[in-house]
Amino acid sequence: MELKALFNLDPNVKVRTRFAPSPTGYLHVGGARTALYSWLYAKHNDGEFVLRIEDTDLERSTPEATAAILDAMEWLNLTWEHGPYFQTERFDRYNEVIDQMIEQGLAYRCYCSKERLEELRHQQEANKEKPRYDRHCLHDHEHSPYEPHVVRFKNPQEGSVVFEDAVRGRIEISNHELDDLIIRRSDGSPTYNFCVVVDDWDMGITHVVRGEDHINNTPRQINILKALGAPIPVYAHVSMINGDDGQKLSKRHGAVSVMQYRDEGYLPEALLNYLVRLGWGHGDQEIFTLEEMIKLFELEHVSKSASAFNTEKLLWLNQHYIRELPAEYVAQHLAWQYQEQGIDTSKGPALTEIVSMLGERCKTLKEMAASSRYFFEEFDGFDEAAAKKHLKAAAVEPLEKVKEKLTALSGWDAHSAHEAIEQTAAELEVGMGKVGMPLRVAVTGAGQSPSMDVTLAGIGRERVLARIQKAIDFIKAKNA
């Protein structure tokens, strides 16, 4: 029987990349960068992007992790043309190919016991040889196919595997370094390295972008592809991401999963912009729209060196995008933060107004939601330091006067509120701060907020007047 790829693919598509995470945990920033590079390369070349879930590790793979990966990809807006495909749904296909390989002499059954393999390894180590299988079962005719066995790929014993890595250049591995890889376990399940090969073949993958930790798998996979008569993709192995201390990025460096960044109030545009620059660049340019990334991205410009993750740089980018993206769009992401923090925004200013007021001040949307709570709900008490400094006996007169002015307003907007504050200061012959600061603490509970006119307009007349009275009562009670 002839070995051939399974899927009917569009022959006009010249580039087809894939992202193939294992659902054993959340999508971390290293995986997200790999997905982004793979996605950008496909888009840059008018190609297609395939999403594949490599869930052959049945013990560690979970539906929750799969859902989290899909959520993260959707949040980042890294859409896919094909998939998601699940390896566990393709076991029949893998076993079909393995059986054909046995039939054609490309693979063989191995009946060796664990004890024999352990003894072989000890002998080879004692002789200072590289541990590898000795092909004891290659021509075995004594055992029945129904006896317990694994299946091994018959790896070439001569020559070398040579491939041109799109990031690292020429890589050559002698076949003497490679073993006869197990491609099917004794329980009948195919192994990771084999499933990957069949998937890449069936799915017409032309370019494999993945982490440098996969380099050792590549020669083994290339040899299997050659045995199948399948085309060899271009491989591009990207470097690891380290923390700012030079150590491999981990939880101790802060958030490492993509959705943690969403939870912390980052915009997807900021994270994508940061990740694309973490190992790739275009001159001195720092800010890239997604359209610019697609236009400019080339694998040849990806760095071979490890990159250092810098949270301050990501924060800077996030504030840039909060400030520069349309307020309507930012407000959609901000709404999720309010929901997470249990803040009911049904009574208060439009969220686009919050973005306009606080966009220059806040580095994250989480900070923006937390610091604008007073627009939507009452606060229990005043910030202790702010109250001590500004809610003194001398503040009663300015607060009573400005309350009187605000009560008398026919309309309620930022301009009218500003005039009321200005008139109060003029009549009392004091600086604007003598009115504005006690007023700020009175209506927000804290010593910092956007300008008082827009803050008052956003909070609303009824709440503002009630809070001013509450502050006056607080001062009088404190000084009674």
UniProtKB/Swiss-Prot annotation:
A motif ('KMSKS' region) lies at residues 248-252. Zn(2+) binds at C110, C112, C137, H139. Its EC number is 6.1.1.17. A motif ('HIGH' region) lies at residues 21-31. InterPro entries: aa-tRNA-synth_I_cd-bd, aa-tRNA-synth_I_codon-bd_sub2, aa-tRNA-synth_I_CS, aa_tRNA-synth_I_cd-bd_sf, Glu-tRNA-ligase_bac/mito, Glu/Gln-tRNA-synth, Glu/Gln-tRNA-synth_Ib_cat-dom, GluQ/Sye. It catalyses: tRNA(Glu) + L-glutamate + ATP = L-glutamyl-tRNA(Glu) + AMP + diphosphate. CDD domains: GluRS_core. It is found in: Cytoplasm. Monomer. Belongs to the class-I aminoacyl-tRNA synthetase family. Glutamate--tRNA ligase type 1 subfamily. This is Glutamate--tRNA ligase. It comes from Mannheimia succiniciproducens (strain KCTC 0769BP / MBEL55E). The gene is gltX.
